[in-house]
Regions:
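Contiguous segments within soluble domain cores/interaction surfaces
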Residues: 1-148
């Protein structure tokens, strides 16, 4: 997963995205295309018949390092305010919306900032997966704050 987005300072901006995984992990694929991916469900029933569910912690970091200071953080669930925080919009297909608010842009100022997305247990908020890198060169996902 790789996100490269731009928000305008002083405005609320929402972004929609989905989490996809490689469908066939048994075959070595050297060049992936869209048909090689399938949605990663954010809730469902596992092979043992147990329910699972994820919430998302969306963070904007001060630097592209694992121990970077967290500048902005939003916990995103199926019930959070889609206008101010973001929301899981289609859990079965791994789709969600995140928001960079006017207040977030005031905290961040202008520039590019790395993004970290954590899939956490929806009940305990314990980290299960962390998504930071993507793109063809495994770059940090990022948001750029601009002024118009």
């Amino acid at each position: 997963m790789y996100i490269d987005c731009t928000a305008v300072k002083g405005e609320n901006t929402s972004f929609s995205c989905g989490i996809n995984i490689v469908s066939d992990t048994t075959t070595k694929i050297t060049k992936l295309n869209n048909s090689d991916f399938s949605p990663f469900p954010l809730s469902g029933v596992d092979e043992n018949g147990d329910y699972y569910g994820y919430s998302i912690i969306f963070r904007i970091l001060g630097a592209p390092t694992a121990d970077a200071k967290v500048l902005v953080e939003h916990v995103i669930t199926a019930n959070t305010d889609i206008e101010t925080e973001g929301q899981i919009t289609d859990s079965a297909n791994g789709q969600f919306t995140f928001v960079i608010s006017k207040e977030d842009t005031d905290v961040l100022g202008l520039g590019k900032f790395p993004i970290q997305i954590c899939l956490v247990d929806e009940n305990t908020l314990e980290n299960v997966y962390t998504l930071t890198l993507g793109g063809e060169r495994d770059e940090f996902s990022k948001v750029q704050i601009v002024q118009v």
